[in-house]
Amino acid sequence: AIAPLLLVNNYSPDGLEPPTFNILSFVRVAPLLVVAVFVLALKEMASVGLLPVYGVRSGLTEATAALMLFFAAIGGAVLQFPIGWFGDYFSRVGVMVVCGLIGIAGAVVLPFVIMVPWLLFLTLFVWMGFFAGVYTITLTLAGQWFRGNELAIAIASFGVFWGLGGLAGPVIAGYAMDVWGPNGFPLMMGASATLLIVFCMVPRFRQAPRTAAVVRSTP
């Protein structure tokens, strides 16, 4: 990872305006994007670490519980294409809201289908696939709202807040499962999706930051 950087020789593109914010102030500049990245990282790392545990504690065999991750991952890969298409032709924040609503719906449905394998796998495919689409839309919004050095700072900020969400996810989900039993896992997932939707509903957060160059008019 370091080797290519040694060949760059401190190269910097010409003609770029200096950024008007840094990683810390990015929270104030684009809070919706920060929350979206944090929520998705929380969901991803909690799922990788605890989704099979949730399955076993709910009565599934270890083999079936392991398959839960497989179908969740397949959904996360396949459904990015239609989600990206919707993001090109419809309101991107609106698509993010739909992904969040499906995140809540999946959390509600999961405990009721846990013992029916085909329904469980279908639910995980759709639920995790659309929930993962939040990051697709977040990247698209970053490209729409920022240019040049500001885009570089935005993407770097994503890495920081992804790391924070990834650290918090297993801890919060594990605590929820200790307190409320196995269903603490979908409860945490639903709560995180709700937080995302709340931020999407705030008009100020739905608009391009004033410091950024707006590339397209689609909100």
Located regions from the model:
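Transmembrane alpha-helical segments of major facilitator superfamily
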Residues: L67-G76, F158, W162
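Structural signature of the two symmetry-related core transmembrane helices
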Residues: G94-V109, G190
